[in-house]
């Protein structure tokens, strides 16, 4: 009976460690995904601003180059 308890305790301990490692890996994966999502979010905010600036300055540049203002 004592050896059975010992074996069950060992299995419980190893299972707990395994679950802990899985949780750490899952948290690390979520952090990596969050960084990727932030990069995409920054990119989404940056591109419209860049397009807006280009829309404002492009006609002025074309006007000066062609001298048809």
From Swiss-Prot:
Keyword Secreted found: yes
The record's Gene Ontology cellular component field reads: extracellular region
The answer to whether the entry has keyword Secreted is yes
Q: Name one GO biological process term.
A: defense response to fungus
Prosegment location in residue numbers: 23-43
The role this protein plays is:
Antimicrobial peptide active against a variety of Gram-positive and Gram-negative bacterial strains. Has antifungal activity against C.albicans ATCC 10231 and a slime mold isolate. Has hemolytic activity against human erythrocytes.
Q: What protein is this chain from?
A: Brevinin-1CG5
Q: Which organism is it from?
A: Amolops chunganensis (Chungan torrent frog)
